[in-house]
Amino acid sequence: MLELTKEQIQQLVDTIESKQDCHCSVSNSMRTIWITSSDGENELRVAFLGNFALVFSRVEFAHKRCGTMTAILFALKKICEENGVHRIIIQSVLTPEMESFCCKSGCKPDPNSTMEVGGVLTGDYFFDF
């Protein structure tokens, strides 16, 4: 079963802290990594889905459109490539900002889990590479 290394987790923490100007803590529960800022304004959940995919969700950043998600996706893609994983699943996209990010980044909506709500195509998105 794949797991993120301490170094990989720290890279994600460093990215969030520098882009969001915050201090983060990490918790690890059942091979799932939760990164949250002390003020509760920033959050990210990351876990491998077996050897099939890396899943991230619970994306919330106080400062939007400053490159945080682009840097996170780049780091996660590199981690996946190092482990022979070729799919990232962005789970529970709910906001126009995340929908826009997914489309801009080449992610495809999962036809089995997405639906339009208030003009936003919500649900899961796949990033295959």
Predicted regions and their residues:
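Short amphipathic alpha-helix that is part of the acyltransferase structural core
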Residues: M1-T32
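Conserved hydrophobic beta-strand within the GNAT/NAT acetyltransferase core sheet
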Residues: I88-S92
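A conserved beta-strand-loop-helix scaffold within acyl/acetyltransferase catalytic domains
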Residues: T32, T36-A53, S57-R58
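Conserved acetyl-CoA-binding loop-helix of GNAT-fold acetyltransferases
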Residues: R65-K78
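A short, internal acetyl-CoA/4′-phosphopantetheine-binding micro-motif in the GNAT/acyltransferase core
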Residues: S57-C66
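Conserved active-site alpha-helix within GNAT-family acetyltransferase domains
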Residues: E82, V93-E116
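C-terminal "cap" of GNAT-fold acetyltransferases
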Residues: T114-F129
